[in-house]
UniProtKB/Swiss-Prot annotation:
Main location: membrane
Designated name of the protein: Uncharacterized MFS-type transporter YxiO
Gene coding for it: yxiO
CC per GO annotation: plasma membrane
One Pfam entry name: ATG22
Coiled coil (UniProt feature): none
UniProt KW Membrane keyword: yes
GO molecular function annotations of the record: transmembrane transporter activity
Length: 428
């Protein structure tokens, strides 16, 4: 019988509850609408503002992709993982709070602080993901990782509901606050939520697997980084999984971050978009947990196939989408898989990596994900500019899922795993 979740597991899971508010309010819902409105008031066309947002996302992910591997390598040393985690959380929370105080006419400055907040959010996730090996054994990783995403979707709905309520009341002129001010209040609420519920993670989760500190940490970290690059190619399962992940997670991330902007381009009202995104969060919560449970029965790889195929259907459907009802259907399709595919990717990879070098390898997990996240938004941005049609840009993402699922077919089936044990026994 499955034992109850430990204090360390619950504290780790609770960070998903904390940072998912940023993911829905800032990345997906309110900020894109606030930014699109601010840019439109400054005379920027819908297609151009979508392109600028795509470029901004690409820049932030490129910066983190450059920093991720070396920071992860340094963080493998004793006592370093939590320090780096705390630094990026602090940067993310502070810059998110700053979005609440920048006048809407300064839309370029908004993009700048959004970039910093995105780097803080994603940077903290590198170390958060790597802590999975410290808080739970391999046999529970799928379950704990999926619980994190599930709880994250549930928790994010609370600040999201508050944000929607304030914005809708402002639109109806029920409260003496402008829609712009109401939107910015949601950024401050998100920052406070993120910071508050990070505290249990800081207090109760500790680095169990590490390398003893030595002289010249930075220099030696660069040396170890080079060694890791060579070793990754030697681990066939690990390398193939990262390659598949590079493509399919790009499509997933791009759809998540650009969905609200796309809906706005189709003429769907901001109120409808916010409600749709809220329902998406509610639906996604149980499906994330279901993915984790089904992975215990059918293997994580099988459930990854399911998620990728659903996203391929999303790309095709998005091309023909015209009405708000179509967007509802699209959102529900995404909701069934977005949490599950991310949770199982995280736990699948965690089972393959040497635990003492988890940050080092998760740094590469991050760089594969982040470089992929550059390609997707750029594909959206360039296609939108060339064709003037957001639907064509979204449809083009299907090629990423096709390539990803083909490569994933060559990855050995998930086991408990012999590969991971062999890697842990190797002198690194």
């Amino acid at each position: 019988m499955m034992k109850r979740f430990t204090k360390q597991e619950n504290s780790w899971v609770l960070y998903d509850w904390a940072n998912s508010a940023y993911s829905i309010v800032v990345t997906t819902a309110v900020f894109p609408l606030f930014y699109k409105s601010a840019a439109a008031e400054s005379g920027v066309s819908a297609a151009q503002s979508t392109a600028y947002l795509g470029y901004t996302i690409a820049i932030s992910t490129f910066i983190l992709a450059m920093l991720g591997p070396i920071l992860g390598t340094i963080a493998d040393y004793e006592g370093c993982k939590k320090k780096f985690f705390g630094f990026f959380v602090s940067a993310g929370v502070a810059s998110t709070a700053m979005l609440a105080f920048i006048p809407s006419e300064h839309w370029l400055l908004l993009l700048l602080f959004y970039t910093v907040s995105a780097i803080g959010f994603s940077g903290a996730n590198v170390f958060y993901d790597a802590f999975l090996v410290d808080v739970t054994p391999e046999k529970r990783m799928n379950l704990v990782s999926a619980r994190g995403f599930g709880l994250g979707y549930i928790g994010s709905t609370i600040p999201f509901i508050i944000s929607i309520a304030v914005i809708l009341l402002a639109q109806a002129e029920t409260i003496p606050v402008s829609v712009s001010a109401a939107s910015q209040l949601s950024f401050f609420i998100t920052a406070a939520w993120w910071g508050l519920f990070t505290i249990p993670m800081i207090k109760h989760v500790h680095q169990r697997y590490y390398i003893k500190k030595e002289p010249h940490i930075v220099i030696n970290s660069f040396k170890r980084l080079g060694q890791t690059m060579k070793r990754i190619r030697q681990y066939r399962a690990l390398f193939l999984f990262l390659l598949a992940y590079f493509f399919y997670i790009d499509g997933v991330g791009t759809i998540i971050t650009m969905s609200t902007s796309y809906g706005s381009d189709l003429g769907i009202g901001s109120s409808s978009l916010l409600i749709i995104l809220f329902v998406t969060q509610v639906v996604a919560a149980p499906f994330s947990i279901i993915y984790g449970k089904l992975a215990e029965r059918f293997t994580g790889k099988t459930m990854l196939y399911v998620g990728i195929v659903i996203y391929m259907i999303v790309c095709v459907y998005a091309y023909f989408m015209e009405t708000t009802l179509d967007f509802w259907i699209l959102a529900m399709l995404v909701a069934t898989s977005q949490g599950g595919i991310q949770a199982l990717s995280r736990s699948y990879f965690a089972k393959l990596v040497p635990k003492r070098h988890a940050n080092e390898f998760f740094g590469f997990y991050n760089i594969f994900g982040k470089f992929a996240s550059i390609m997707g938004p750029l594909l959206i941005a360039v296609t939108a500019q060339l064709t003037g049609k957001s639907s064509t840009a979204v449809f083009s993402l299907i090629i990423l899922f096709v390539i990803g699922i083909v490569i994933l077919a060559f990855v050995p089936e998930e086991t408990s795993t012999d590969v991971s044990q062999q890697q842990n026994d190797l002198p690194l």
